[in-house]
Amino acid sequence: DPAPALSAPCSEPCPETCSAPAAETAELAEETSLTTAVMPESPVMADSLTHGQRVAAIAATLFQDLAELHGLDDVWGHRLHLAAQLHDIGFAEGRKGHHKISMRLIEEDLSLNIHEDDRPWVALLARYHRKAWPSRRHARFDALKKSDRKALRKAASLLRIADALDYTHTGVVGNLAVAVKKRKVIIAVQCSGDCSAEMERVIKKGDLFMHVFGRELECVCQGN
């Protein structure tokens, strides 16, 4: 299958049809305020903040381009955006198990400007950005009604792919486009350098996506 055509970079606010993962200045200001509320001043946390912004932009593109496939509404798009921003705040207490720490911080830190209706969902999404899939062996996930479990799995699968596309935290992946085929989803990315680590990671972390949507996942780099 041919790779989908990449969108040109936006030099001004992007229309709805543009797939370039660029955030508006005002949005970045709001997002920075959100994350710095819990992030101590350190190189590690500064990197996590920048990485979170990139992952949020990529996740927004995936959410938009895959809308017909996932069928989630804008409420879930907003939750995904917040979770992408905050998924690595657990690094504030160390790398080991940081996904679970991120969940706890999102749940407990009321300085984060998250609506209380969204907070538990954002926390769960951050928890499932890595390691174990959402599972009914987990009490919090099991307590959800079936439709909510299904929606959370879908959103978590997108977050894991978005995170993988900035695996090296270098911003090597720029614009991307998604094509949905009958048995396959193709993600075409524009890379500014070697993105082999990202390509490999997408397939590894895309296992939940392939399970949830029953489609093979392919990621191709089209260069600059």
Tell where the protein language model's regions lie, with residue ranges.
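C-terminal helical "lid" subdomain and adjoining coupling/linker elements of P-loop NTPases
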Residues: A22-E24
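Divalent metal-dependent catalytic cores for phosphoryl transfer on phosphate-bearing substrates
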Residues: V38-M45, H51, A56-V178
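Ordered, soluble secondary-structure elements with a strong preference for glycine-centered loop motifs
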Residues: L49, E93-K96, S196-I203
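Low-complexity, glycine/alanine/valine/leucine- and proline-rich hydrophobic stretches
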Residues: L159, L165-C219
